[in-house]
Regions:
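Active-site neighborhoods and metal-handling regions in enzymes and metal-associated proteins
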Residues: 1-340
Length: 340
């Protein structure tokens, strides 16, 4: 088995980091697992550092290459052999990314504790930044505030979105664009620490009364999010949850809205697996983490949650953010739009 993607390196090393160039799926090292041996393949400029600082308890034989020799992937294929599977395309190896992702679960107690801490820190950062933003700020400034607070905790962000006013209605992924903040602001990060992800979306409104159009869209999102959370029970089908989402949108008078954004998915070392709902065989498992990113035109909600040994828990909502309880088989306390 060849593991060249950064998220799979994070997983097999229990939080190690193969990154040099951040915005890239593959890292600067590969792990090869055979029946006899585990290998770390990297170029000499990175190999010793990764071996010393990023492998944690994983023992591997080091194979270091000079830049003018074989590529890391070619060397990995040579060691793995022609009947190998891989998380990236390399020569004749079978690409089996989703099968490899399935090995990440069930998650461990230690991974749960790391996710819980990351969720709590994320909640605190969103609350702090929300209280500090002001009308008229540029969206880049708000992004910088979020990224700075995460960086202080040694947390990186794979995604950061800041939307304001009409851009929240027009775009599902409002990258900062140099706009001044209006009354309505959407904040989103996909944060990562030790390879594990916490994807959160929160909203702020400046004023005494939230416009009905915004309030209605947000309420629909929360109700659908609560439904999805209620279905995160071991053995339930991902495809059935998608059917339920479609039904919820239709009942809310938005029958086409489900097509406009991914339905949500499993998270962890992979930032999000949003395609699980398309296969009728995929089932919810014990000890999984979830990222239900529910949108309706003008609103979005998203929290980190887990299905853990018979209980469901929202890890990114600690109670400091204004919230409301929703009933969907059980009670779910979900963040609301913060009014300032």
């Amino acid at each position: 088995m060849i593991l060249a993607r950064q998220d799979n390196f994070n997983w097999i090393t229990d939080g190690g980091n193969s990154r040099v160039i951040v915005p890239r799926d593959t890292g600067h090292a590969a792990i090869v697992v055979t029946q006899e041996q585990i290998y770390l393949i990297a170029q000499v400029m990175d190999g010793q550092r990764i071996m010393d600082e990023e492998m944690n308890a994983l023992e591997a034989e080091a194979v270091f290459l000079h830049w003018f020799e074989a590529s890391v992937l070619d060397k990995a294929y040579e060691l793995a052999g022609p009947k190998s599977v891989s998380d990236v395309q390399v020569q004749d190896a079978e690409v089996a990314l989703n099968d490899i992702y399935s090995l990440h679960y069930p998650m461990t107690d230690e991974e749960y504790q790391r996710m819980k801490r990351l969720g709590a820190i994320s909640d605190g950062i969103f609350y702090k930044v929300a209280k500090e933003i002001r009308l008229g700020m540029i969206d880049y400034e708000v992004e910088a505030m979020l990224l700075y607070e995460f960086a202080k905790e040694n947390i990186q962000c794979d995604v950061s979105l800041i939307g304001t006013d009409d851009r929240i209605f027009k775009y599902r992924h409002p990258n900062p664009s140099g706009r001044k903040l209006g009354r309505y602001v959407l904040l989103h990060t996909a944060s990562r620490q030790g390879g594990l992800h916490c994807n959160v979306t929160r909203s702020v409104y400046f004023g005494d009364k939230i416009p009905e159009e915004i309030a209605k869209a947000y309420e629909i999102c929360c109700k659908i999010e609560a439904f999805c959370m209620s279905q995160c029970k071991t053995g339930n089908k991902w495809s059935d949850i998608l059917k339920g989402q479609k039904r919820c949108y239709t009942e809310a008078g938005m029958p086409e809205e489900w097509k406009c954004h991914y339905p949500g998915g499993r998270t962890g070392y992979c930032v999000s697996q949003s395609d699980l709902s398309l296969d009728t065989h995929n089932e919810i498992q014990n000890r999984e983490a979830y990222d239900w990113y529910i949108t309706a035109t003008g609103a979005k909600v998203e929290e980190l949650s887990v299905n853990w040994d018979g209980r469901f828990e929202v890890l990114s909502h600690t109670g400091i953010w204004p919230s409301k309880k929703y009933i969907a088989e059980e009670v779910f306390d979900l963040p609301q739009i913060m009014q300032l």
